[in-house]
């Protein structure tokens, strides 16, 4: 109930602010769709790259593997879902088709697919099994459907060499998307990667109009952060400058953008591979690496999409499963139990902690239902003697800011919004004593 009341109060405050400024009223800032809000809440997803190149040792499928050797005989969708849960993730993105064009579902568009595998006598369906397992475990499912298709002669973005070839491939790709959305949905997010030229918006509008389209040429999507290292810049705004039909281009976003299109950080648990290779366990990112990535993505308000690499048998290797669990456990250890927490409206929000406790982190979150409004803020701590001292300054808050600083003993914390694009609603202000190593790059103190 309090969330509904708080949301209504925020809308009332925004209307009052508009009336107070007089003259030409500013445009109301963009706000996320309900689907985007759910995506923000998930914060962490797991990517799963599996294709025939796991039998070849390369990053791209050269189509040299005999079809009777493409045999994920130990694939268990429940194990993949367990990996998602262990990592503390809320969704998965499955690469149902990568650049080679191999389709991991029962498609009518090509024989270069799982239906020509000996697995389950050609009746196996990785995507179908994952869809059922995700529904059962309440994990949201998304799909990467690569526009490039070497089998069909379509290059980057789905671009064919001749007009007649382009028309033929457009029909194939649109049919593949239709099959996925019709037979395996609902989908949480569709990954099209950058530069897709195949017209698909009408298919999405007909079958799944609210879906999050990564790098899609449509509103209500998500965008690439600009690197594959798992690090977001700071600030990394949730809005961009966008025109209908364009692919999102602003990795860091823009505070005055006209479209809500948040960034997603993708990175593989293997360096530098997106796909499994023999003997790759030694290249799994360390727990220290993963925690740094978490601070530099989720800790900057950006979703993290962490890639796992199932092997040639379709199984997530035990070493990766163990590291994913370590990662999830470490995040929970750090941030599951705040010393104190509060929420509220306005430019000043105080949090009483007690009779002087040591803290080294503050987490701040805006209520994104009314948009992203904070433009500059500072966090202060009140020492036991009553003196307020500045702990850190920042610009963006957005979905979440994990703000570390040197350990200090305080009785209270105060958030002061110094600049904003309208009345501010803070959904969370929490103080923590993490007392664990913090990545150097996570510390910041804006002017």
Question: What are the roles of these predicted feature ranges?
Answer:
Residues 410-414:
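Short, conserved beta-strand segments of beta-strand-rich sandwich/propeller modules, principally
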Residues 23-406, 416-435, 445-446:
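Mature catalytic domains of secreted/periplasmic carbohydrate-active enzymes
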Residues 1-6, 84:
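Positively charged n-region of N-terminal signal peptides that target proteins for export
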Residues 436-440:
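Intrinsically disordered, low-complexity Ser/Thr-rich linker and spacer segments
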Residues 6-16:
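Bacterial N-terminal signal peptides
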């Amino acid at each position: 109930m309090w969330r509904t009341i708080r949301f209504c109060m925020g809308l009332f405050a925004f209307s009052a602010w508009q009336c107070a400024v007089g003259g030409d009223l500013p445009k109301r800032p963009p706000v996320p769709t309900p689907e985007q809000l759910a995506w923000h809440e998930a914060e962490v997803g797991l990517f799963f790259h599996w294709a025939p190149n796991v039998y070849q040792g390369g990053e791209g499928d050269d189509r040299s593997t005999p079809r009777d050797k493409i045999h994920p005989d130990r694939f268990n969708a429940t194990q993949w879902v367990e990996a998602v849960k262990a990592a503390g993730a809320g969704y998965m993105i499955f690469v149902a088709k990568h650049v080679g064009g191999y389709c991991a579902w029962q498609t009518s568009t090509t024989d270069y697919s799982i239906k020509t595998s000996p697995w389950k006598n050609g009746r196996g369906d990785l995507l179908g099994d994952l869809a059922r397992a995700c529904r059962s475990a309440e994990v949201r499912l998304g799909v990467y459907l690569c526009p490039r298709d070497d089998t069909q002669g379509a290059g980057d973005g789905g671009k064919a060499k001749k007009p007649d070839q382009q028309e033929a491939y457009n029909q194939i790709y649109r049919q593949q998307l239709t099959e996925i959305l019709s037979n395996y949905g609902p989908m949480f997010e569709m990954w099209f990667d950058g530069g897709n030229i195949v017209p698909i918006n009408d298919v999405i509008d007909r079958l799944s109009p609210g879906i999050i389209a990564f790098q899609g040429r449509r509103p209500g999507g998500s965008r690439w952060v600009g690197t594959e290292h798992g690090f977001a810049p700071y600030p990394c705004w949730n809005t961009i400058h966008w025109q209908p039909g364009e692919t999102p281009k602003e990795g860091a976003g823009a505070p005055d953008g006209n479209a809500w299109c948040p960034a997603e950080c993708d990175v593989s648990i293997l360096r530098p591979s997106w796909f499994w290779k023999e003997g790759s366990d030694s290249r799994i990112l360390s727990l220290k690496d993963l925690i740094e990535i978490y601070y530099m993505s989720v800790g900057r308000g950006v979703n993290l999409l962490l890639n796992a690499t199932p092997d040639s048998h379709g199984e997530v290797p035990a070493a990766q499963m163990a590291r994913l669990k370590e990662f999830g456990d470490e995040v929970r250890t750090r941030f599951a139990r705040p010393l104190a927490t509060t929420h509220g409206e306005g430019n000043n929000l105080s949090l009483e902690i007690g009779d002087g406790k040591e803290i080294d982190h503050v987490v701040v979150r805006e209520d994104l239902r009314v948009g992203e409004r904070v433009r500059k803020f500072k966090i202060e701590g009140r020492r036991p003697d009553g003196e307020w001292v500045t702990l850190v300054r920042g610009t963006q808050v957005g979905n979440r800011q994990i703000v570390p600083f040197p350990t200090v003993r305080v009785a209270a914390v105060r958030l002061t919004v110094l600049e904003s694009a309208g009345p501010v609603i803070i959904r969370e202000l929490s103080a923590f004593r993490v007392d664990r190593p913090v990545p150097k790059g996570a510390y910041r103190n804006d002017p």
